[in-house]
């Protein structure tokens, strides 16, 4: 696609495109060499491994680092599918298509997110069962969460947690409500996409999987 754009062979709504990263949807008329083409042919999805200590946003009034400080200029117009907070890590999906973003974020589409979570203290069976039934805290109702202990000691516990929604700071809020602190939070999967061995601060292009 970038090669076609550099050769000025693509038009959107009659205007020649001279840079990548333009958001398009079904409402746009896209042409390649004066022939109409389906808009999804230009859809792009990237996987990015977000490090701790950066924001999922294009800019920050406090001048804190954002994920776009790690990405090349050609991806500066990409939009994120979901978010991770400043101190969370792991998989972020990026796309140039707002319809794809909405598809993955809408709760009714039920895309699973999987996290590895480190908490201070011990997580017992009672907590695991409570998560499985759904959790209510700070006047917010959270859907059932499947959690399992990966490893533990007297001081900490590593969990894998499977969620079907993406409420703001969901995992952190749940553990705060039972006086436990999350010290690491890493998303390893979102729907059909997995973090795999992608290194921190690195990205790769992926095929669209509905």
Predicted regions and their residues:
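Basic, flexible Lys/Arg- and Gly-enriched helix-loop patches that mediate nucleic-acid binding at interfaces
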Residues: 2-210
């Amino acid at each position: 696609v970038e090669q076609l754009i550099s050769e000025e062979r693509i038009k959107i709504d009659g205007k020649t495109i001279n840079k990548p990263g333009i958001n398009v949807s079904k409402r746009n008329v896209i042409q390649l060499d004066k022939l109409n083409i389906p808009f999804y042919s230009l859809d792009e999805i990237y996987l990015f491994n977000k490090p701790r200590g950066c924001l999922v946003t294009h800019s920050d009034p406090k001048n804190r680092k954002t994920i776009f400080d790690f990405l090349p200029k050609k991806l500066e117009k990409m939009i994120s599918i979901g978010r991770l907070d400043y101190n969370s890590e792991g998989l972020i999906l990026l796309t140039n298509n707002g319809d794809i973003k909405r598809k993955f974020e809408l709760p009714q589409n039920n895309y699973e997110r999987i996290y590895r979570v480190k908490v201070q203290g011990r997580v017992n069976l009672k907590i695991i069962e409570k998560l499985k039934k759904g959790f209510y805290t700070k006047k917010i109702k959270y859907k059932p969460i499947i959690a399992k202990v990966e490893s533990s000691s007297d001081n900490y516990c590593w969990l894998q947690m499977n969620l079907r929604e993406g409420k703001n700071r969901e995992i952190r809020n749940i553990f705060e409500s039972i006086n436990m602190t999350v010290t690491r939070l890493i998303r390893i999967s979102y729907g059909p996409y997995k973090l795999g061995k992608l290194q921190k601060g690195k990205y790769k292009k992926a095929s669209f999987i509905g």
